[in-house]
A protein has these predicted regions:
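Cysteine-centered motifs
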Residues: 8-11
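Short, Lys/Arg-enriched N-terminal segments with co-localized hydrophobic residues
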Residues: 29-40
Length: 552
């Protein structure tokens, strides 16, 4: 027998991703069961093994939740710094179960639970709250979490139907197993691992769901396959590189003073280099994080750079300190697509899951296995795009417009040399519209990581390319209401934004607007958008061609 240490204490992650800890909870297990932490494990054929894995997960969740409740406020400040506060209320309890849901409706129900759990995870907690801020903070971690949840759901359903290749090597089971119970159990188990302090809510939701299904052998088998699917993907993602905590600028991460290099946002002073190590995470399907690394950005002395510079300078100003030629509609577009990690909204993966479900509903995608496959494809493509994008971001370390425009002229910036481009005219007070500090009290901001390529453009490129491949065409009209404009979300002055619905005639129209929105906010260059979309498209094609394929 050997003793394994399961983490709690000063935690940054759930047990599935390996915590950074100050203390541990120890459990003795047999040597045969050490395979839990082995990324090379491909099959789970032992029922006892699965039960041990589930038990270990529960122990880790309980231990972690208790300790993490004491850590949330310092962790909030580690990410947002001293300028931001929120009065936002939790969203986790807004999913009352409706009796009689079929399997497809249950999948939609648990998808909503998952993405709103991520929204709550990005909401700094208030006195009396039982959840903890930031288990899966930021676009990379959020996309990984959603991929894990939706792989588990797909694997559970596919084990029952057996139509597609298994991602984790799960054997097929009795076709009479309850799909409804399989969905609920797989979602529950993975969500508890991803967001351990929210597990009491997930437990209640699972109980309500399972109580709606009469006790039977089919119910028991559905629960079992849901547990197996969750355990399998959690084991595969253990020690995948996501356990590395986010470095703090000036402490764990020293930014460069060189011309063209990324530096901290001088307005918000966000104190982290978010995703600085995310390019080291093992991809889900890609061969490596650098497989589709973007080409270098334009040289600072080039006409291409000057053209992009002039565009964001003209369109991206805040209209107060910096004048702008941006129209009211362009301002709306900039905010509409934002979801910049602010309370309740979460990061872009939540937005793109909402769009996926909207299109699936409008396309009448009601077959539960097909819908589960679509969600697995979308979320895995986004997760791998996130890894690939952040690998390129920190490889090139390219500056944001606020830095590039303020330091364009000779005599500005740390070196005083300027950008060396006679076609650019600097503005040392340039103030972008910025990523909206929705549901926060604090300034709009430039996200705390390098510009090139754009994460939004890359995630969007992955999403819309998967949708094109899945449905076989680009001309899919749809309407969508963003949570940035849902009649509830507040701006950083406490004003409730109106409800706005936007219509798109095709996927490519939405894809382009999503990428362009970042230029309207003044936080990205046009080449960030172009190469971000291209990278996301390439990742999506690779994922679609290599995962969740029909059995031959």
């Amino acid at each position: 027998m050997r003793a394994f240490a399961f983490p709690c204490g000063d935690c940054y992650r759930s047990a599935a991703g390996t915590f950074r800890t100050a203390r541990t909870t120890t459990l003795t297990i047999s040597a045969a069961e050490e395979k839990i932490g082995n990324l090379t494990m491909k099959r789970l054929n032992s029922s006892s093994f699965r039960k041990v894995l589930v038990a270990l997960s529960i122990i880790a969740i309980v231990a972690a939740s208790s300790s993490l409740a004491q850590q949330s406020q310092p962790r909030t400040q580690e990410y947002w710094g001293q300028q931001f506060q929120t009065n936002r209320k939790p969203v986790a309890q807004q999913h009352p179960f409706r009796p009689g849901l079929n399997a497809s409706e249950r999948l939609r129900h648990w998808n909503e639970i998952a993405i709103d759990a991520s929204g709550l995870d990005h909401t700094p907690n208030q006195p009396g709250d039982t959840y903890v801020f930031g288990h899966q903070l930021g676009p990379g971690r959020a996309s990984r979490a959603m991929a894990i949840v939706h792989i588990a759901i797909f694997e559970a359903l596919n084990a029952i139907e057996g139509k597609y290749e298994s991602y984790v090597g799960l054997d097929t089971v009795d076709k009479h197993a309850s799909m409804e119970c399989a969905i609920a159990q797989a979602a529950h188990d993975t969500l508890c691992e991803m967001f351990p302090s929210q597990s009491p809510s997930f437990n209640q939701l699972l109980t309500e769901d399972l109580n709606d299904v009469a006790d039977s052998e089919a119910k028991a088998k559905g629960i079992e396959v849901g547990q197996s699917a969750a355990a399998a993907i959690l084991a595969l993602r253990n020690n995948d590189g996501s356990e590395t905590p986010e470095p703090r600028i000036g402490i764990d991460w020293i930014t460069s003073n060189d011309v063209g290099r990324w530096r901290q946002d001088p307005i918000s002073l966000l104190p982290v280099a978010l995703g600085a190590h995310w390019g080291e995470v093992t991809p889900f399907v890609l061969r490596s994080s650098s497989q589709f690394r973007t080409p270098p950005p334009p040289a600072l002395s080039s006409v291409a750079y000057a053209t992009a510079y002039d565009e964001v300078k003209a369109l991206g100003g805040d209209g107060i300190v910096t004048p702008t030629s941006r129209t009211n509609e362009q301002t709306t577009i900039g905010i509409f697509w934002a979801y910049d990690g602010t309370p309740s909204l979460c990061a872009p993966p939540r937005l793109y899951n909402q769009i996926t479900m909207r299109i699936a509903d409008e396309r009448h995608t009601h077959d539960v296995v097909e819908l589960a496959r679509l969600l697995a494809l979308v979320n895995v493509a986004m997760a791998d795009s996130g890894i690939a994008i952040w690998e390129s971001k920190f490889y090139y370390d390219f500056w944001r417009p606020i830095t590039g425009i303020r330091e364009s002229d000779p005599g500005t910036g740390p070196t005083g040399t300027g950008d060396g481009n006679d076609l650019t005219a600097g503005d040392v007070t340039f103030s972008p519209l910025g990523a909206p500090a929705s549901n926060l009290n604090g300034p709009n901001f430039t996200p705390p990581f390098p510009a090139y390529p754009s994460g939004h453009a890359g995630f969007g490129g992955a999403l819309f390319q998967i949708l094109r491949r899945f449905y076989g065409k680009d001309r899919i009209p749809f309407t969508f209401i963003s949570d940035e404009f849902n009649g509830v979300t507040e701006d950083n002055h406490g004003n409730t934004r109106p409800l706005i619905e936007r219509h798109f005639s095709s996927l490519s129209e939405a894809e382009e607007e999503n990428g362009q929105s970042r230029i309207y906010l003044g936080i990205h260059w046009s080449f960030d958008k172009t190469e971000g979309i291209r990278l996301g498209n390439r990742v999506a094609d690779f994922v679609f061609d290599h995962a969740f394929r029909k059995r031959r």
